[in-house]
């Protein structure tokens, strides 16, 4: 059976892995998942990620990050989902925790944070919120 929301599955694996104090989590890879992982790494929410070939399919390994024994990601939640897509213009992009967190947005210029989207004057689909 195929997965209906692979991005929500990715976010859930990261959330569950951090609650279980895992060093890393693995999941099936895709271009969008790699782009989201790159944004999370650039913002300092994960240690890093790598894509490797496993059993004929690409696998994404995400190295989780902790500070003083606690997960760096306090909250990660899906906003736009297959049943209800959420699109926002430049001026309507959400601010997470008044700028302390990030919203990950899929724009015509690629996947980026809400701050980068505002600076580029582009809107798009709000994928998730991370704090």
UniProtKB/Swiss-Prot annotation:
Gene3D superfamilies given in the database record: 3.30.1370.30, 3.30.1490.10
Pfam families linked: Ribosomal_S8
GO molecular function: rRNA binding; structural constituent of ribosome
GO biological process: translation
Keywords tagged on the record: Ribonucleoprotein, Ribosomal protein, RNA-binding, rRNA-binding
Keyword rRNA-binding found: yes
Entry keyword Ribonucleoprotein: yes
Primary role: One of the primary rRNA binding proteins, it binds directly to 16S rRNA central domain where it helps coordinate assembly of the platform of the 30S subunit.
Assembly behavior: Part of the 30S ribosomal subunit. Contacts proteins S5 and S12.
HAMAP family hit by this protein: Ribosomal_uS8_B
Membership in a protein family: Belongs to the universal ribosomal protein uS8 family.
NCBIfam families per record: PRK00136.1
Name by which UniProt lists this protein: Small ribosomal subunit protein uS8
Species, as recorded: Azoarcus sp. (strain BH72)
Gene field: rpsH
């Amino acid at each position: 059976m195929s997965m209906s929301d692979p991005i929500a599955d990715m976010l859930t694996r990261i959330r569950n892995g951090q609650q279980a104090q895992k060093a890393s989590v693995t999941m099936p890879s895709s271009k969008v998942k790699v782009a989201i992982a790159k944004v999370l790494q650039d913002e300092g929410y994960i240690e890093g990620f790598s894509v490797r070939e496993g059993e004929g399919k690409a696998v994404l390994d995400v190295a989780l990050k902790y500070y003083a024994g606690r997960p760096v990601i306090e909250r990660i939640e899906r906003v736009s989902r297959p049943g209800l897509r959420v699109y926002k213009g430049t001026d309507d992009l959400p601010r997470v925790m008044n700028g302390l967190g990030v919203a990950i947005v899929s724009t015509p210029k690629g996947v980026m944070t809400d701050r980068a989207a505002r600076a580029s004057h582009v809107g798009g689909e709000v994928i998730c919120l991370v704090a």
